[in-house]
Amino acid sequence: MLEINEFGDSTYVEWGDPDRFFGGMALFKAGKAQKLVFTGGKMPWNKAKKTEGEVLRKYAISNGIASEKIYITKDVENTADEAVAVKELISQSKRIILVTSAFHMYRAKRLFEKEGFEVIAYKVDYKTEGENVTTIMDFLSSSGNLAKTESGIREIIGR
């Protein structure tokens, strides 16, 4: 799993997927960075009192991460906001390990580089396995394909 041979000042875990959390935890525990940063991700329509970052902080502490090594950004709604919030929170860190889905990495990496970070990409949550063979079933309507379309549109508009 830990195929990354580089080290960063911080490991930043984007929100929205448990693979990101577990990937970030594994990198931190392997000594790849000195800080673990979670997002204060919270959508305006979400009435929960806690952000995902606050919940993940609790899980990280219960898994042996010292609380002083964990940072949480202010509330953010999208990846562009995340990059700015991370820069404000850990401005002294120049090199980060960005943990996000393989599908989302290209855009996320560009946004963090725009904020001045040197980004080491750590991709999780791959959507394909091995060789992808197209069959007639790929051309039929399905709820799964609708979900893939939604993911693509969200990536294009930056949500």
Question: Which residue stretches match the model-derived regions?
Answer:
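A transmembrane-helix-recognition feature enriched in membrane-embedded lipid enzymes
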Residues: 148-159
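A structural signal for short, hydrophobic/glycine-enriched beta-strand patches
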Residues: 1-143, 149
